[in-house]
Design a protein with these regions (language model features):
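Catalytic active-site module of serine/aspartate enzymes centered on a nucleophile-bearing elbow/loop
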Residues: 270, 274-321
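Short beta-strand/loop motif that positions the catalytic acidic residue
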Residues: 245-247
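Alpha/beta-hydrolase-fold enzymes
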Residues: 121-208
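N-terminal cap/lid segment of alpha/beta-hydrolase-fold proteins
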Residues: 1-27
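Alpha/beta-hydrolase active-site loop
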Residues: 81-102
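Active-site glycine-rich loops that stabilize anionic/oxyanionic intermediates
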Residues: 33, 37-41, 115-116, 249-250
Length: 321
């Protein structure tokens, strides 16, 4: 029987704590998978995927970012921090990795980031190289540098006009709102997430997914996108760490396949070599909520199992520094 535990741990942002979930398998875990969720959602949406992995022997964990899910206690949805929000969010990912790693120091440890969570995972690989056994980047991409710079500038201007907790219809339309244009005529504003109408409706009905991100979060995320695109920063990664890419062929965040292929090339240029890419025809942004999610789970499980030590955890375990 899978055991699910809710807990909190201190955030890098003073005075805040992060709500987290852990899914423990029935027997001794073979490895750990830490989920890093996307924008305007929460870790509870990954329950089905986490249970699948736990059924196959993995301990799964993940936290609600600042301004997301049950981490929010003051109504500040979609808000990281007044300043340095991206770094704080990345440090919270790192804190959970250290916490879980301390409990299981010899287990292989994997990060799995979706969408904004994939950008945070890429940030993690730069800031703390060699401290995970592997990473999975799902729903990732890379917008052209001039577009990212423009987005950061507009968000910063709106931040000065509205304050860091303000919400700008202009910024939302230019960013997330643009994704649905590719799927006209659309049934809902979120058709770009999945081909499965029931999954789209579940997202729209989820009260923890209804807030719009603040202008400061967009500003911080644009800064994060600039960081993870810089050659000098990519060179800081440990090239021996395997990275798996999962993306829908119809995912606008991944540029309909082109953007995620660009990210693979960026990793190759940084010296990384173990970089399998799975592009799923017809699939949109949220692969774990897509019609072919069982296919995605199977590919993910195969990749994880192929990167486990042949006879259980290595004596030295995974670096916990």
């Amino acid at each position: 029987m899978i055991r699910t535990t809710h807990f909190h741990y201190p955030s890098a942002r003073d005075g805040c704590s992060i709500h987290a979930l852990e899914w423990a398998p029935e027997g001794p875990p073979r490895g750990i998978v830490q989920l890093v969720h996307g924008i305007s959602e929460h870790i509870g949406r990954y329950d089905e995927t986490a249970r699948f992995l736990a059924e196959h022997g993995f301990l799964v964990c993940g936290g609600d970012h600042l301004g997301h899910g049950r981490t929010v206690t003051d109504g500040s949805y979609g808000f990281f921090a007044p300043e340095n929000g991206w770094t704080l969010a990345a440090r919270d990912v790192r804190a959970l990795r250290k916490l879980e790693g301390a409990h299981h120091p010899k287990l292989p440890y994997f990060l799995l980031g979706h969408s904004m969570g994939s950008f945070l995972t890429r940030t993690y690989l730069i800031l703390w190289p060699g401290t995970v056994s592997g990473a999975v980047l799902m729903g990732t991409g890379q917008e052209p540098a001039p577009l990212v710079a423009l987005g950061k500038r507009i968000s910063a201007l709106e931040c000065r006009r509205l304050g860091p907790r303000g919400v700008s219809p202009l910024v939302h339309t230019l960013s997330l709102g643009a994704y649905n244009r590719r799927f006209r005529p659309s049934r809902t504003p979120s058709d770009w997430l999945s081909r499965d109408p029931a999954e789209v409706d579940a997202f729209l009905a989820d009260p923890l997914c209804q807030s719009r991100p603040t202008v400061s979060l967009f500003r911080d995320m644009m800064g994060g996108l600039q960081l993870i695109a810089r050659r000098d920063q990519l060179a800081r990664m440990d090239p021996s760490v395997p990275v798996c890419f999962l993306s829908g062929q119809e995912d606008p965040v991944g540029g309909m396949g082109r953007g995620v292929e660009q990210v693979v090339r960026m990793f190759q240029d940084a010296g990384c070599r173990d970089l399998p890419l799975h592009l799923y025809p017809g699939a949109r942004h949220e692969l774990f909520h897509e019609q072919n999610r069982r296919e995605v789970w199977a590919d993910l499980l195969d990749w994880l199992e192929d990167r486990l030590p042949p006879s259980g955890p290595l004596d030295g375990g995974t670096p916990n520094g």
